């Protein structure tokens, strides 16, 4: 043991009935993956992969499928919609948020997520966690983050850091970059329609100034923009990524496609009744349920428009499989949806040269699921093996879960 992580033999081979490599290619049957340290050095049929003597060999049951680690493209480390009145918990002390982030990250890892994009956190909890992972103090996914996300005081965003002016937002962006932010984020619109309209809390001039400030710092910029004029103003300003886009219209879809703008789909908050029931506001609970049909319709259009899309769980901890299932329900093939949640997600994070697919030279971020996701994509909920950087984490996570259960008795 080194820290909390089990270090495998220098070379490890995994044999599987099938491998879905994340590129969209036809799955390999009766296949093997060879890992040296934390790097994949070969992948192919068992006959084509030469396994050196002394290699540790993991042979998966015939009913399991080997895949790349999944990528959660929109996550808030300390947020969990499955906690009662969770919106009040975001105001807890930062030390408590950090502890909650540990639990959330462990659940996400166990669901097969090995890379995460964080879209607003308080107290630099995300950066502290990333440092703790790098130092071997905790186990966790690969993290790319905007650190704090900003909103105008008059605006929406319960995890947003409030600012009173564009100048204050510029200073906040600069502080984020100095602290270690990989990209930047601000909040523009609300989340649900109000009287059939989507409120926007920033003017076109303010949005343009914010986008320019981020780009001047050499960072891409993501925006919480759900629909309406606010989303169009973001596209006019040249944002790099739209988060959520629940009510994106046909014109916006065409503009996003033309500009190569990303859309990160986070369908769960409109469709997960368990999560919705934990909201304190009856009005918000009703709005989320009432607006489901329109969200399904608009996101289905976007998914089928050949946009650059990724998926995220937002605060629905451990539910990445639900987002992949939503893509399939909207018309994607299972193979395409898996690519979105692996290689495509890695492209969004800017790590596709090292993660997102099972290819030679990439990091050994590997999971297995019980079943064949090409026949039934919902089996992605049944994650067995979890490996990040060639280190097997599922056994540790299961042991920690057992200890937690014993402690609670």
Predicted regions, residues:
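His/Asp/Glu-enriched, well-ordered alpha-helical/loop segment
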Residues: 216, 286, 290-373
